[in-house]
Amino acid sequence: MKTIHVTASREYDVVIGAGLLNECGQRIAAAVPGAEKAVVYTDTTVFPLYAKRVTDSLKAAGFTVLQDYFLAGEHSKTFRNWERILRFFTENRVSRSDVVVALGGGVVGDMVGFAAACYQRGVRLVQIPTTLLAAVDSSVGGKTAVDLPAGKNLIGAFWQPSLVICDTDTLQTLPDAVRRDGCAEIIKYGVLDGTALFSRLENSLPDEIPEDILARCVEIKRDIVAADEFDTGARHLLNLGHTAAHAAELLSDYSLSHGSAVAMGLCSMARACAARGLCTEEDAARIEALIKKCGLPTELPYTAEALANAALSDKKRAGSTLPVITVEGLGRCTVRKIAASDYAGWLRQGGAK
Protein backbone atom coordinates (compact mmCIF):
# COMPACT_ATOMS: atom_id res chain seq x y z
CA MET A 1 0.00 0.00 0.00
CA LYS A 2 1.17 3.52 -0.84
CA THR A 3 0.09 6.77 0.83
CA ILE A 4 0.80 10.13 -0.81
CA HIS A 5 0.14 13.26 1.22
CA VAL A 6 -1.17 16.26 -0.70
CA THR A 7 -0.69 19.79 0.59
CA ALA A 8 -3.16 22.29 -0.86
CA SER A 9 -5.95 24.50 0.49
CA ARG A 10 -7.03 21.28 2.18
CA GLU A 11 -4.44 18.65 3.12
CA TYR A 12 -5.34 15.04 2.45
CA ASP A 13 -3.99 11.60 1.72
CA VAL A 14 -4.19 9.55 -1.46
CA VAL A 15 -4.16 5.89 -0.43
CA ILE A 16 -3.36 3.29 -3.11
CA GLY A 17 -3.57 -0.46 -2.53
CA ALA A 18 -5.53 -3.67 -2.85
CA GLY A 19 -8.66 -4.43 -0.82
CA LEU A 20 -9.28 -0.85 0.32
CA LEU A 21 -13.01 -0.77 -0.49
CA ASN A 22 -13.72 -3.21 2.33
CA GLU A 23 -12.16 -0.86 4.87
CA CYS A 24 -13.09 2.48 3.31
CA GLY A 25 -15.67 3.30 5.98
CA GLN A 26 -13.13 3.53 8.79
CA ARG A 27 -10.73 5.55 6.66
CA ILE A 28 -13.47 7.98 5.66
CA ALA A 29 -14.67 8.33 9.26
CA ALA A 30 -11.14 9.28 10.31
CA ALA A 31 -10.81 11.81 7.47
CA VAL A 32 -14.15 13.58 8.05
CA PRO A 33 -14.74 13.68 11.82
CA GLY A 34 -18.27 14.61 12.84
CA ALA A 35 -19.94 13.47 9.63
CA GLU A 36 -23.17 11.54 10.22
CA LYS A 37 -24.45 11.01 6.68
CA ALA A 38 -22.42 9.67 3.78
CA VAL A 39 -23.86 10.22 0.31
CA VAL A 40 -22.47 7.69 -2.17
CA TYR A 41 -22.90 8.88 -5.75
CA THR A 42 -21.87 6.71 -8.69
CA ASP A 43 -22.96 5.73 -12.21
CA THR A 44 -24.82 2.84 -13.81
CA THR A 45 -21.59 0.98 -14.60
CA VAL A 46 -20.03 1.14 -11.15
CA PHE A 47 -23.21 0.85 -9.06
CA PRO A 48 -23.71 -2.93 -9.48
CA LEU A 49 -19.97 -3.61 -9.11
CA TYR A 50 -18.89 -1.73 -6.01
CA ALA A 51 -21.68 0.33 -4.43
CA LYS A 52 -22.77 -2.34 -1.94
CA ARG A 53 -19.21 -2.98 -0.76
CA VAL A 54 -18.70 0.73 -0.11
CA THR A 55 -22.07 1.31 1.55
CA ASP A 56 -21.66 -1.76 3.78
CA SER A 57 -18.27 -0.49 4.93
CA LEU A 58 -19.68 2.97 5.62
CA LYS A 59 -22.59 1.55 7.62
CA ALA A 60 -20.20 -0.58 9.64
CA ALA A 61 -18.28 2.62 10.45
CA GLY A 62 -21.45 4.22 11.83
CA PHE A 63 -22.61 6.36 8.91
CA THR A 64 -26.18 6.79 7.77
CA VAL A 65 -25.77 6.02 4.08
CA LEU A 66 -27.62 7.49 1.11
CA GLN A 67 -26.90 6.43 -2.46
CA ASP A 68 -27.85 7.38 -5.99
CA TYR A 69 -26.44 7.07 -9.49
CA PHE A 70 -26.72 8.47 -13.01
CA LEU A 71 -26.21 7.11 -16.51
CA ALA A 72 -22.55 6.37 -17.20
CA GLY A 73 -20.68 8.41 -19.81
CA GLU A 74 -19.47 11.90 -20.70
CA HIS A 75 -22.91 12.84 -22.03
CA SER A 76 -24.17 12.74 -18.44
CA LYS A 77 -21.75 15.45 -17.31
CA THR A 78 -24.33 18.19 -17.74
CA PHE A 79 -25.73 21.10 -15.79
CA ARG A 80 -29.08 19.29 -15.61
CA ASN A 81 -27.63 16.17 -13.98
CA TRP A 82 -25.51 18.30 -11.66
CA GLU A 83 -28.71 20.05 -10.54
CA ARG A 84 -30.35 16.66 -10.00
CA ILE A 85 -27.53 15.71 -7.62
CA LEU A 86 -28.08 18.93 -5.67
CA ARG A 87 -31.80 18.20 -5.42
CA PHE A 88 -30.96 14.77 -4.01
CA PHE A 89 -28.82 16.47 -1.36
CA THR A 90 -31.57 18.89 -0.38
CA GLU A 91 -34.34 16.27 -0.39
CA ASN A 92 -32.28 14.16 2.00
CA ARG A 93 -31.28 17.09 4.21
CA VAL A 94 -27.57 16.63 3.72
CA SER A 95 -25.62 19.15 5.79
CA ARG A 96 -22.22 20.76 5.41
CA SER A 97 -20.90 18.54 8.19
CA ASP A 98 -21.69 15.37 6.20
CA VAL A 99 -19.62 13.77 3.43
CA VAL A 100 -20.15 13.07 -0.26
CA VAL A 101 -18.41 10.03 -1.73
CA ALA A 102 -17.73 10.08 -5.48
CA LEU A 103 -17.39 6.43 -6.51
CA GLY A 104 -16.39 5.92 -10.14
CA GLY A 105 -14.35 7.29 -12.99
CA GLY A 106 -13.58 10.81 -14.12
CA VAL A 107 -17.13 11.83 -15.00
CA VAL A 108 -18.40 10.82 -11.56
CA GLY A 109 -15.55 12.55 -9.77
CA ASP A 110 -15.88 15.74 -11.80
CA MET A 111 -19.65 16.16 -11.54
CA VAL A 112 -20.21 14.87 -8.00
CA GLY A 113 -17.20 16.87 -6.86
CA PHE A 114 -18.67 20.02 -8.39
CA ALA A 115 -21.97 19.38 -6.62
CA ALA A 116 -20.10 18.96 -3.32
CA ALA A 117 -18.18 22.19 -3.97
CA CYS A 118 -21.37 24.20 -4.51
CA TYR A 119 -23.85 22.66 -2.08
CA GLN A 120 -24.18 24.99 0.92
CA ARG A 121 -20.88 26.54 -0.26
CA GLY A 122 -19.02 23.30 0.22
CA VAL A 123 -19.57 19.86 1.75
CA ARG A 124 -16.70 17.48 2.38
CA LEU A 125 -15.78 15.14 -0.45
CA VAL A 126 -14.08 11.76 -0.71
CA GLN A 127 -12.96 10.48 -4.09
CA ILE A 128 -12.91 6.71 -4.74
CA PRO A 129 -11.66 6.35 -8.32
CA THR A 130 -12.44 3.06 -10.09
CA THR A 131 -10.72 3.72 -13.42
CA LEU A 132 -7.04 4.06 -14.20
CA LEU A 133 -7.51 7.56 -15.60
CA ALA A 134 -9.32 8.78 -12.49
CA ALA A 135 -6.83 7.07 -10.17
CA VAL A 136 -3.74 8.79 -11.59
CA ASP A 137 -5.27 12.09 -12.64
CA SER A 138 -8.78 13.43 -12.17
CA SER A 139 -9.38 12.31 -8.56
CA VAL A 140 -6.38 14.29 -7.30
CA GLY A 141 -5.91 18.05 -7.34
CA GLY A 142 -9.37 19.46 -6.70
CA LYS A 143 -10.64 20.23 -10.20
CA THR A 144 -14.39 19.63 -10.56
CA ALA A 145 -16.65 20.55 -13.47
CA VAL A 146 -19.47 19.88 -15.88
CA ASP A 147 -19.55 20.39 -19.63
CA LEU A 148 -21.45 22.91 -21.73
CA PRO A 149 -22.43 22.54 -25.40
CA ALA A 150 -19.64 25.04 -26.17
CA GLY A 151 -16.91 22.97 -24.54
CA LYS A 152 -15.58 20.62 -21.89
CA ASN A 153 -15.37 21.53 -18.19
CA LEU A 154 -16.53 25.11 -18.72
CA ILE A 155 -18.46 25.30 -15.42
CA GLY A 156 -16.51 24.16 -12.41
CA ALA A 157 -14.76 24.85 -9.14
CA PHE A 158 -11.60 23.97 -7.29
CA TRP A 159 -12.64 21.75 -4.37
CA GLN A 160 -10.03 19.55 -2.77
CA PRO A 161 -11.20 16.20 -1.39
CA SER A 162 -10.70 15.16 2.21
CA LEU A 163 -9.40 11.75 1.12
CA VAL A 164 -8.74 9.75 -2.05
CA ILE A 165 -8.97 5.95 -1.88
CA CYS A 166 -7.75 3.94 -4.85
CA ASP A 167 -8.45 0.22 -4.50
CA THR A 168 -6.23 -1.34 -7.14
CA ASP A 169 -8.51 -4.38 -7.28
CA THR A 170 -11.01 -2.22 -9.19
CA LEU A 171 -8.40 -1.60 -11.89
CA GLN A 172 -7.74 -5.28 -12.63
CA THR A 173 -11.05 -5.96 -14.39
CA LEU A 174 -11.39 -2.79 -16.46
CA PRO A 175 -12.48 -3.21 -20.08
CA ASP A 176 -9.52 -2.91 -22.44
CA ALA A 177 -10.72 0.42 -23.85
CA VAL A 178 -11.03 1.97 -20.39
CA ARG A 179 -7.61 0.65 -19.40
CA ARG A 180 -6.09 2.14 -22.56
CA ASP A 181 -7.60 5.51 -21.71
CA GLY A 182 -5.75 5.49 -18.40
CA CYS A 183 -2.50 4.55 -20.14
CA ALA A 184 -2.68 7.81 -22.11
CA GLU A 185 -2.56 9.88 -18.92
CA ILE A 186 0.22 7.70 -17.50
CA ILE A 187 2.29 8.27 -20.66
CA LYS A 188 1.71 12.00 -20.21
CA TYR A 189 3.24 11.76 -16.74
CA GLY A 190 6.17 9.83 -18.17
CA VAL A 191 6.85 12.64 -20.64
CA LEU A 192 6.58 15.24 -17.88
CA ASP A 193 8.80 13.32 -15.44
CA GLY A 194 11.68 12.17 -17.59
CA THR A 195 13.65 9.28 -18.98
CA ALA A 196 13.63 7.02 -15.90
CA LEU A 197 9.85 6.79 -15.62
CA PHE A 198 9.31 6.84 -19.37
CA SER A 199 11.70 3.92 -19.86
CA ARG A 200 9.84 1.95 -17.19
CA LEU A 201 6.58 2.62 -19.00
CA GLU A 202 8.08 1.43 -22.27
CA ASN A 203 8.84 -1.88 -20.57
CA SER A 204 5.60 -2.30 -18.59
CA LEU A 205 2.66 -0.72 -20.43
CA PRO A 206 0.01 -1.71 -21.19
CA ASP A 207 0.10 -5.09 -19.44
CA GLU A 208 1.68 -4.20 -16.11
CA ILE A 209 1.02 -1.07 -14.09
CA PRO A 210 2.65 -1.59 -10.69
CA GLU A 211 1.41 0.23 -7.62
CA ASP A 212 4.57 2.31 -7.45
CA ILE A 213 3.97 3.66 -10.97
CA LEU A 214 0.46 4.75 -9.97
CA ALA A 215 1.95 6.40 -6.90
CA ARG A 216 4.64 8.17 -8.94
CA CYS A 217 2.00 9.65 -11.26
CA VAL A 218 0.08 10.95 -8.24
CA GLU A 219 3.30 12.38 -6.76
CA ILE A 220 4.02 14.27 -9.99
CA LYS A 221 0.56 15.78 -9.95
CA ARG A 222 0.80 16.47 -6.21
CA ASP A 223 3.99 18.47 -6.66
CA ILE A 224 2.63 20.52 -9.55
CA VAL A 225 -0.64 21.25 -7.73
CA ALA A 226 1.29 22.32 -4.62
CA ALA A 227 3.10 24.91 -6.75
CA ASP A 228 -0.02 26.18 -8.55
CA GLU A 229 -3.27 24.92 -7.04
CA PHE A 230 -5.55 27.24 -9.00
CA ASP A 231 -4.10 26.63 -12.47
CA THR A 232 -2.64 30.04 -13.22
CA GLY A 233 0.76 28.92 -14.52
CA ALA A 234 2.78 25.80 -13.73
CA ARG A 235 -0.31 23.60 -13.43
CA HIS A 236 -0.89 24.11 -17.16
CA LEU A 237 1.85 21.48 -17.60
CA LEU A 238 -0.72 18.85 -16.65
CA ASN A 239 -2.62 19.83 -19.80
CA LEU A 240 0.10 18.39 -22.04
CA GLY A 241 -1.78 17.12 -25.10
CA HIS A 242 -5.10 18.30 -23.72
CA THR A 243 -5.76 21.42 -25.81
CA ALA A 244 -6.10 19.37 -28.99
CA ALA A 245 -7.73 16.57 -26.98
CA HIS A 246 -10.54 18.71 -25.61
CA ALA A 247 -11.12 20.23 -29.05
CA ALA A 248 -11.35 16.77 -30.62
CA GLU A 249 -13.74 15.58 -27.91
CA LEU A 250 -15.97 18.59 -28.52
CA LEU A 251 -16.00 18.04 -32.29
CA SER A 252 -16.88 14.37 -31.79
CA ASP A 253 -19.82 15.30 -29.54
CA TYR A 254 -17.96 13.29 -26.88
CA SER A 255 -18.11 10.02 -28.79
CA LEU A 256 -14.30 10.12 -28.65
CA SER A 257 -12.98 8.95 -25.28
CA HIS A 258 -10.82 11.29 -23.24
CA GLY A 259 -7.86 8.93 -23.21
CA SER A 260 -7.94 8.45 -26.97
CA ALA A 261 -8.12 12.20 -27.44
CA VAL A 262 -5.19 12.78 -25.07
CA ALA A 263 -3.11 10.19 -26.94
CA MET A 264 -3.78 11.98 -30.24
CA GLY A 265 -3.06 15.38 -28.71
CA LEU A 266 0.18 14.18 -27.15
CA CYS A 267 1.39 12.69 -30.44
CA SER A 268 0.44 15.85 -32.29
CA MET A 269 2.35 18.10 -29.91
CA ALA A 270 5.43 15.84 -29.89
CA ARG A 271 5.55 15.86 -33.70
CA ALA A 272 5.05 19.62 -33.88
CA CYS A 273 7.83 20.19 -31.36
CA ALA A 274 10.18 17.92 -33.31
CA ALA A 275 9.32 19.79 -36.52
CA ARG A 276 10.16 23.09 -34.79
CA GLY A 277 13.43 21.77 -33.39
CA LEU A 278 12.23 21.93 -29.80
CA CYS A 279 12.75 18.21 -29.18
CA THR A 280 14.53 15.44 -31.03
CA GLU A 281 12.86 13.24 -33.61
CA GLU A 282 13.88 10.31 -31.42
CA ASP A 283 11.91 11.58 -28.41
CA ALA A 284 8.83 12.23 -30.55
CA ALA A 285 9.14 8.75 -32.07
CA ARG A 286 9.43 7.12 -28.63
CA ILE A 287 6.28 8.89 -27.45
CA GLU A 288 4.35 7.82 -30.53
CA ALA A 289 5.65 4.24 -30.32
CA LEU A 290 4.54 3.86 -26.70
CA ILE A 291 1.11 5.26 -27.51
CA LYS A 292 0.77 2.77 -30.36
CA LYS A 293 1.98 -0.06 -28.12
CA CYS A 294 -0.91 0.70 -25.77
CA GLY A 295 -3.38 0.40 -28.65
CA LEU A 296 -4.20 4.10 -28.63
CA PRO A 297 -4.79 6.28 -31.72
CA THR A 298 -2.15 8.74 -32.88
CA GLU A 299 -3.90 10.78 -35.60
CA LEU A 300 -6.35 13.61 -34.96
CA PRO A 301 -9.45 12.95 -37.09
CA TYR A 302 -10.32 16.61 -37.72
CA THR A 303 -8.79 19.42 -39.74
CA ALA A 304 -6.38 21.85 -38.15
CA GLU A 305 -8.85 24.69 -38.74
CA ALA A 306 -11.74 22.86 -37.07
CA LEU A 307 -9.61 21.92 -34.07
CA ALA A 308 -8.16 25.42 -33.71
CA ASN A 309 -11.65 26.92 -33.84
CA ALA A 310 -12.89 24.49 -31.18
CA ALA A 311 -9.87 25.37 -29.04
CA LEU A 312 -11.14 28.94 -28.78
CA SER A 313 -13.56 27.56 -26.17
CA ASP A 314 -10.65 26.20 -24.13
CA LYS A 315 -10.80 27.53 -20.57
CA LYS A 316 -7.03 28.18 -20.60
CA ARG A 317 -7.31 30.77 -23.39
CA ALA A 318 -6.63 34.33 -22.27
CA GLY A 319 -7.97 36.81 -24.80
CA SER A 320 -6.13 36.24 -28.06
CA THR A 321 -3.45 33.99 -26.52
CA LEU A 322 -3.52 30.27 -25.92
CA PRO A 323 -1.05 28.43 -23.68
CA VAL A 324 0.38 25.30 -25.28
CA ILE A 325 2.54 22.79 -23.47
CA THR A 326 5.57 21.95 -25.55
CA VAL A 327 7.78 18.87 -25.36
CA GLU A 328 11.44 19.87 -25.35
CA GLY A 329 12.68 16.47 -24.27
CA LEU A 330 11.57 13.76 -21.86
CA GLY A 331 11.22 15.53 -18.53
CA ARG A 332 11.51 18.96 -20.16
CA CYS A 333 8.11 20.44 -20.95
CA THR A 334 7.30 24.14 -21.09
CA VAL A 335 4.18 26.30 -21.06
CA ARG A 336 4.34 28.65 -24.05
CA LYS A 337 1.82 31.37 -24.80
CA ILE A 338 1.05 31.60 -28.49
CA ALA A 339 -1.40 33.61 -30.55
CA ALA A 340 -4.60 31.59 -30.80
CA SER A 341 -4.53 32.30 -34.52
CA ASP A 342 -1.21 30.41 -34.77
CA TYR A 343 -2.51 27.21 -33.20
CA ALA A 344 -3.68 25.72 -36.51
CA GLY A 345 -0.07 25.84 -37.71
CA TRP A 346 1.06 23.78 -34.72
CA LEU A 347 -1.69 21.27 -35.43
CA ARG A 348 -0.63 20.94 -39.08
CA GLN A 349 2.94 20.30 -38.01
CA GLY A 350 1.52 17.68 -35.67
CA GLY A 351 -0.13 15.86 -38.56
CA ALA A 352 -3.62 17.38 -38.79
CA LYS A 353 -4.79 18.31 -42.28
Where are these regions (language model features)?
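ATP/NTP phosphate-donor binding region
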Residues: 1-98
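A glycine/threonine-rich phosphate-anchoring loop and its flanking beta-alpha core
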Residues: 15, 114-205
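Solvent-exposed alpha-helices and their adjacent loops that cap or buttress functional pockets
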Residues: 93-95, 118-119, 147-148, 155-158, ...
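Generic secondary-structure signature for well-ordered alpha-helical cores
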Residues: 160-164, 169-176, 184-196, 203-206, ...
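C-terminal charged capping/lid subdomain of soluble metabolic enzymes
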Residues: 184-187, 278-353
